[in-house]
Amino acid sequence: LWAMCASYGLDPRSSDPDALFEDDAELLDELRGWAARNAGETLLPTGKNLRNLNPIVRESGGERQLDLGWWGYLVDGAPSRFPSINTRSERLAERRGALPSTAVVPATSWFEMQKPSRQWFSFGAGDTEPQLFALAAVTQPGRTADGDAFTCYSVIMRPAPERLAHVHDRTPLLIPAAFMGDWLAGEAPPSELIAAAIAES
């Protein structure tokens, strides 16, 4: 499961042609500022000691906000022993009750390993320049053994469409601008919200 999506990129030179964050210039500036300060870095699951945190966008009080999240879940003060950087869309769709809090993860590329060749492939939205897109995620609060509190997140993986299935059988669930509000509000039943997100992706 860890190989499903264990790294992605966020290029500070990215454009936002789909207007994912067009209505919030301050958020977009914060995001690009973070990307510039971390230019050239591959975004990886958060390490227990390094504590690398990555940008996520959530909704609070009807407004979108940029937070730094811990990629993977914290359980009993430590990174979970079960794989938690990714969550299968089917698992969420079958969930009883409401979804965990929803978020999106800004990115300009993601990386998948093709098996058995162990060859890495990079996927992105722009042909000539990096373009922003949004990975669907769910979040939950977490706390380390020393008492520090974090927002933890898990990237949602869906069955890969046919055009990508030759590389990997799973792919991140992408949230387009037109569906961003519905996704971040997270009000629909899980099965409906996940089905709609996949249809819009």
Segments the model singles out, each with a brief description of its role:
Residues 1-201:
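Short linear sequence motif anchored by a di-proline
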